[in-house]
Amino acid sequence: MADGLNRVHYNPSTAQLVEFALLRGEGELTANGALVAKTGTRTGRSPGDRFIVKEPSSAADIEWGPVNQAFEPGAFEGLWARVEAFLADKELFVSDLEVGADPEHYQPVRVTTQYAWHQLFARNLFIIPEEFNRQDKPVWQIINAPDFVCVPERDGTNSDAAVILNFAERKVLLAGLKYAGEMKKSMFSVQNFLLPAQGVLPMHCSANVGKDGDTTLFFGLSGTGKTTLSADPKRFLIGDDEHGWAPGGVFNIEGGCYAKCIDLSQKNEPVIWDAIRFGTVLENVVMDEHRVPNYKDSSLTENTRAAYPLEHIAQRKEDNRGAEPHAVVFLTCDVSGVLPPVSILSKEQAAYHFLSGYTAKVGSTEIGSTSAIQSTFSTCFGAPFFPRPAGVYAELLMKRIESFGSQVYLVNTGWTGGPHGIGKRFDIPTTRAIVDAIVSGELKNAETVHLDTLNLAVPVAVPGVDTNLLNPVNTWSDKALYAEYAQKLAEAFTKNFAKYQVSDAIRNAGPKA
C-alpha cells in the first residue's frame, strides 16, 4: 500500500498506539491504565458475514456450508481493490507479526489497520518476533478497514460488513467491523486449515504447564472456563485460546490473551485482573465517572473483553511452548444440570465428545445472541473456526492421544441440582479443585462409578470436592426428573452424532438414548 498520500506508521510501539488512539478519539484511558474502545453495534463475531474464497488450491479440502460460506475470486479481487482505494488517503498502522510460536509452523503476517487501537490489539494478540519471518515464508496480509461500508449488491457480501479469507493469495479482508476479535479468529481459521497438512492438530484450547514440565490442555467454547482455569497461580501459562499439537509438543498460536471481563473479580481471577494495565485493550467495558472499569456492567454487551500480551502475566512459559500433554480437559457447560462435574474418558469417548462438542453459549461471542444461555453442539469445541471436515481434526486428536498416552477428562462447568434457572452453577473453587486433581494425576487411576444413561465413568472421590456433587443424581431433589432430563440429553447427543461417519467403537462410546 502506497504511503505517498497518507501517513503510515510501521511497527509502532504500545505507547505510540495508545497516544494515537486517544488523540484520534478512538478510546479512553481507564484508572488502571488500560485503553477502552467501543465496537458499536457489532459487539461479537459476525458468523453470517464470514467467507472463504472458493478457488482451486483449497476448495476440495474445505467443508462448505453456513460456517464456511463460499466467495467468488473475482468478487474478492474487486472488493480488496475498493478497500485499498478507500484507505489510500487515510492514516494507517502497519506491523509485521507472526502467528504460531513454533519455528517450523509459524505464519508471517503483515497487519494493516485503519484504527490505532486495532493495531494495538493485533500487536497484543499476535506474536512480535525478534526477527521477522526467519524462514522467509510467503507473507499473509490482513487489512482491517472498519469504516468501509460494504454494499451487498456491488460487493457480493451479505450485509454492510465482511470477513473474507483467501488461501490462494494469503489475504484476509475485514471491512465494516470494529469488533477486534475477528482479526485473531481469522488467523486462527487460517492455521486451522494449514496445520493438519503438516501433521499438526490445531486446537481451540488453553494450555499451561507445571513446575515439572507437565502440560494440561483445556478445550471449550467461549465462557466455559478456558482462560480462567488455565490462569492458575500454581502453574505457568502457555496460552489461553489457540494452540497446535505437533509430535513432540504443543505451541501457542498467539502471543496474547483475550479474556472475558464480565463479572471479573480480583478474588476469583487474580491473574487476569493483574494483567489489565497500560497496554491492555478493554472492549465495550463500561467505566464510572472516575474511569474505574465496572466489570459487572453488561449494558453494552455480555461479551466484554480484555486483550493483553502474554508479557502481562508473571507466571508464563516464555517461549509459548510446552511438552505433549499428560492431561486433556474438555470443558462443557451443561445447562440441563445432568452431566457430572468430572468424568474420565476412554480414547473412543474422547473422540465422541470432541466431535460432539456439547456445551452452551454463555455470554456468546456472536452478534445477535441474547444473554440467554442455550445448549449447543460445536464440533471440536470451536466449529466456527475449523474449515476442514471435522473428521480430519478428530483423527489427528486420536493419533496424538494414542501416540503420547494422554488422559482425557470431561469437566462440567455448568449446572447441577437442576437445569439453568433451577439448579446452581458449579463455583470456580470447586472446578479448580477438580482441575488440581486432574493435573496432579490423582484421577488417572481413580475408582469410578458408571452412569449408564450418560455412559460415563465418574470418580467416587476428588480431594477438596463435596462427594455428593460427583454423581449428579444426588444433587437433584426429584430423582425421576433427573432421569427424564438425562434421557433427553442422551437423545440429543445421539441425534446430533448421526451425521458423523465413524467406527462403531466411537459411536458406541456416547450416551445411551
Curated annotation (Swiss-Prot):
Note describing how the cofactor binds: Binds 1 Mn(2+) ion per subunit.
Binding site for Mn(2+): 185, 204, 241
Principal cellular location given in the protein's record: cytoplasm
Cofactor(s) this protein cannot do without: Mn(2+)
Known pathway: Carbohydrate biosynthesis; gluconeogenesis
SUPFAM superfamilies: PEP carboxykinase N-terminal domain, PEP carboxykinase-like
Compartments (UniProt record): Cytoplasm
Record GO terms (molecular function): ATP binding; metal ion binding; phosphoenolpyruvate carboxykinase (ATP) activity
Reactions the enzyme catalyzes: oxaloacetate + ATP = phosphoenolpyruvate + ADP + CO2
GO annotation, cellular component aspect: cytosol
UniProt: ATP binding residues: 185, 204, 220-228, 269, 305, 431
Lineage top rank: taxon: Bacteria
EC number: 4.1.1.49
Any single GO BP term: gluconeogenesis
Binding locations of substrate: 45, 179, 185, 305
Keywords for this protein: ATP-binding, Cytoplasm, Decarboxylase, Gluconeogenesis, Lyase, Manganese, Metal-binding, Nucleotide-binding
Enzyme type, top EC level: lyase
Function: Involved in the gluconeogenesis. Catalyzes the conversion of oxaloacetate (OAA) to phosphoenolpyruvate (PEP) through direct phosphoryl transfer between the nucleoside triphosphate and OAA.
Family: Belongs to the phosphoenolpyruvate carboxykinase (ATP) family.
Quaternary structure annotation from Swiss-Prot or TrEMBL: Monomer.
Name of the protein in its database record: Phosphoenolpyruvate carboxykinase (ATP)
Organism lineage: Bacteria, Pseudomonadati, Pseudomonadota, Gammaproteobacteria, Alteromonadales
